[in-house]
């Protein structure tokens, strides 16, 4: 009996069975149904790394509550452009998911997306002034028109009782609330999308690692494979390869040898969350409440108290608490970081490290935190929290991008970046948040860069069938924005 794939050649090979590969695969299956598709996942189940429901916070990132997307300028004003762009991107994802549900390509939307209001909550005069300014900057925009603001503790308590009950002191507080926020189980969504692929002639392989990738003289990518359990080796050739293996993408990008991948490094950041599955406590909270990151802390460290829906059950999550590990994946190796160092990236990585000593200091302080101090931090947002009701869980690894920079030599970049070869035969995704929430626009960008001719001349009708407002900014058209959000809300059964 053989365990390794016997397929010798494919039009498209996906490395990694997470939300990015699943999204791109579902798109390609509809715009180019004649292409052969093969997926390789190194674990025995899909979406078990960063896409897994407990490896991320499940926030449908649309900049409704994430304060780091709206930085304050020196004059006190708020820059809203990034928030608008992220919300536009999330609307594209909602449209694609809605299309997949409407066509019955995937199952009930309740399995992967639920309405959970998004809130921002701040304390102290400076922060409440900032939040009001942010609200005033966002509210006039069609994509944020439903947002509410309050500095009345009694109103905030109605929105989020656990945040206000037992709160001591008379200092000012403020909150915004967007009722249309969502909680997304990206692990389940990944399984739904890959299930659609498998039902439509794609070959899905589990427990298989891609150990090497090289460009052949036949202009095909030659991949070496290893089945982890049996130890069997194999090989496959592909016309197009997408490296969507999360933190594992950097190593394979480096092995591909494409010039566009040189100079990139990875900075792994681990994290933990508190999880509460006590139904009585979970029933008292229905929101994702985001605060502000501590001074010197990275954007992904913003504290938040979240309602989660996983496997049909409601629970609560608080965090994150940052940490450091040299693994690039939860299932990876402590050698991941040192083995990623190359002559082409050692200087950018060193320069980025020197420019981010504050981040290093922050991570060290987080690693040294006791469980008791972590509970105390949670009580800033849930004053009556009892640590005995909460379980500390390890989140997925986040590998932030380090890259060349003309001025500083190297920078640490938060967010995601698409890397493609000059001929469009291979693409990879590096980085993290907002990540999964914007998988659809990210994969659209990759399609446009790797297949510019087909994207422009052949695929527009199919793409607009999936995403009707593709190429249009919803925020510039209030009527279209309202209609689109109402349509996708109905299809996705969002209350």
From Swiss-Prot:
Catalytically driven reaction(s): (S)-malate + a quinone = a quinol + oxaloacetate
Molecular function via GO: 2-hydroxyglutarate dehydrogenase activity; L-malate dehydrogenase (quinone) activity
Keywords, sorted A to Z: FAD, Flavoprotein, Oxidoreductase, Tricarboxylic acid cycle
Pfam families reported in the protein's UniProt record: Mqo
Signal peptide: none
Superkingdom of the organism of origin: Bacteria
Cofactor section: FAD
Entry EC number(s): 1.1.5.4
Pathway in which this enzyme or protein is active: Carbohydrate metabolism; tricarboxylic acid cycle; oxaloacetate from (S)-malate (quinone route): step 1/1
GO terms, biological process: tricarboxylic acid cycle
Coiled-coil regions listed in the entry: none
InterPro entries registered for this protein in UniProt: FAD/NAD-bd_sf (IPR036188), MQO (IPR006231)
Gene3D superfamilies for the chain: D-Amino Acid Oxidase, subunit A, domain 2, FAD/NAD(P)-binding domain
NCBIfam families linked to this entry: mal_quin_oxido, PRK05257.1-1, PRK05257.1-4, PRK05257.2-1, PRK05257.2-5, PRK05257.3-1, PRK05257.3-2, PRK13339.1
Family, per entry: Belongs to the MQO family.
Listed name of the protein: Probable malate:quinone oxidoreductase
Native species: Renibacterium salmoninarum (strain ATCC 33209 / DSM 20767 / JCM 11484 / NBRC 15589 / NCIMB 2235)
